[in-house]
A protein has these predicted regions:
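Residue-level detector of alpha-helical transmembrane segments in integral membrane proteins
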Residues: 2-3, 137
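Extracytoplasmic metal-acquisition and chelation regions
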Residues: 15-189
Length: 189
């Protein structure tokens, strides 16, 4: 027992000191002397897209994990703190994260760039079911051909915030479009 305790204390101290914010107290991390952008995302599908386009140039903080219903999600105090420290926020849009609209608006007013990734989806591609009370169906990621329109919003937002990463973001965005195109072609066969 004493040996296990003697081993547990230094291991715990190691893990505790290795977690959390940097000495400056902000949420950014440095790589090769350059601070990474802090990007907050909402849903897992938006997180996956942002991580694919951004590569290792940014730190992505996902607010919602797998199985979370974005329609009902209420941001916690931790989420609001993450949003306040973010350089960029990417969310799905089309009222998918309906309860977070006010939080996005406040973040935007404080200078954080916020992007609804669905803003480039052509209106004629959106479904308008009767039960959605005049709003489009926000579940556009189920169609990779439609969801592909969102990649450009992510690439443009990242490039605006980090012009030095322009080429990498463009390469990664094109590679992701090829992947989505392959899925679309597979689904049509």
């Amino acid at each position: 027992m004493a040996t296990a305790l003697a081993l547990a204390l230094p291991v715990s101290a190691f893990w505790l000191t290795g977690c959390g914010k940097g000495a400056s107290g902000d949420a950014s991390h440095e790589t090769n002397g350059t601070a990474k952008l802090v990007v907050v995302t909402t849903t897992t599908h938006v997180t996956d897209m942002v991580e694919s386009v951004a590569g290792k140039r940014v730190e992505v903080i996902a607010l919602m994990g797998p199985g979370v219903d974005p329609h009902l999600y209420k941001p916690s105090a931790k989420d609001v703190t993450a949003l306040s420290k973010a350089t960029l926020v990417f969310y799905s849009g089309l009222m998918l994260e309906g309860r977070m609209a006010e939080v996005f608006s406040k973040a935007s007013l404080k200078g954080t760039k916020t992007y609804a990734v669905t803003k480039n989806v052509p209106e004629e591609k959106l479904l308008h079911p009767e039960e959605f009370a005049g709003h489009p169906d926000p579940h556009v990621w189920f169609d990779p051909e439609i969801w592909m329109n969102c990649i450009e919003v992510v690439r443009a937002g990242l490039t605006e915030a980090d012009p030095a990463g322009k080429d990498e973001y463009a390469r990664n965005a094109e590679a992701l479009k090829v992947e989505y195109g392959a899925v679309t072609n597979w689904a049509k066969t």
